[in-house]
Amino acid sequence: MAKLNIVLFEPEIPANTGNIGRTCVAAGTRLHLIEPLGFRLNEKEIKRAGMDYWEHLDVTRYIDFADFLDKNPGAKIYMATTKAKQVYTDVEYEDDCFIMFGKESAGIPEDILVQHPDTAIRIPMLEEIRSLNLGNSVAIVLYEALRQREFEGMKNEGQLTKYEWGSRQPGQERNLTEQRLAAEQGSSHGDAQG
């Protein structure tokens, strides 16, 4: 399975980072955290959002952006920002590339963005909306990168626990619901008359 890397630049909200950690585990993706963080990694909000997946997360911390660059020389870094000119679906995400997202309150600083004009990407949204939730943004871009790899190594098919797909006739559930509603209406009319 090809490895991708999600980078959070100075994340501030523990629940967002916990959710992103869970997404990274589900996608077989590494998480990189650039300090300062707006929380401690042992906070209960992270663990609650990440559930029991956090212990399986491949996570690396860096003291600042310079430390990140020093420890990942030559890294191809895509910068997810509302300020970018190209859409996230217009690029091809290489193996071992890094997709960086900025802090919730301010995004990625412009002095970093201007160093990466060809790899700055954005998620389209209505003009009057400032930004999407950080966890949602990570999931959107990450799953586009995984889609480009045809979800290699991932489970692409689920299964029901009580039934098998195709074992019930189409529309049968609707008929049962209609019968239940009719029975409830009949009993409520009886109560009103009695």
What are these regions (language model features)?
Residues 1-194:
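Post-transcriptional modification and biogenesis factors for structured RNAs
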